[in-house]
Amino acid sequence: MSRRRVFLIVAVVVFAGWLSWLGYLAAYKTNPVVVSRSQMMASTHFVLAEVKIDSETGKPARDVRVIEDLRPVGVALSGTIKVENIKLGRVGGAKDFREPGLYLLPLTAVGKDVYNLTVQPRSPGQEAINYDSVRPWAYVWDAPGVKEQFESLVPKR
């Protein structure tokens, strides 16, 4: 067997191995949950909340029950709060809100016991955003990596 043929066979085996590795990653390691740094930096409150589903619409109900205020500023949030734009929210770590489950909700206060899921702020150089069309993120607390990312993005106060 000539030297060129050996190099060709080795190259084909390495290429096939590389394609197999990429196929494995595509099949089993897809859709990781990435917690948005800009959304966390723009938020004023971070709560673990239980979200109920409205039986009529199938969408999340605006009233959510706070389980824990993760980084309280002043008095910690507790009880039931209203999240006005939760129906627009997307969920990292799941296809949609589901019961039962704990969700990390990055919030911005808009009134007494009334909050919005924080939308991602405008990036430098980006044209004006129509905030009515932007869908904010909530995160499944038990999804792989969410707790660790949150801890690294939002230090304890």
Which residues does each PLM region occupy?
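Short boundary/loop segments of OB/S1/cold-shock single-stranded nucleic-acid-binding domains
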Residues: 24-44
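Structural detector for short beta-strands of small beta-barrel domains
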Residues: 42-68
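Hydrophobic beta-strand residues in large extracellular and virion-surface proteins
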Residues: 51, 64, 81-83, 103-107
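Generic structural motif
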Residues: 54, 67-69, 73, 86-88, ...
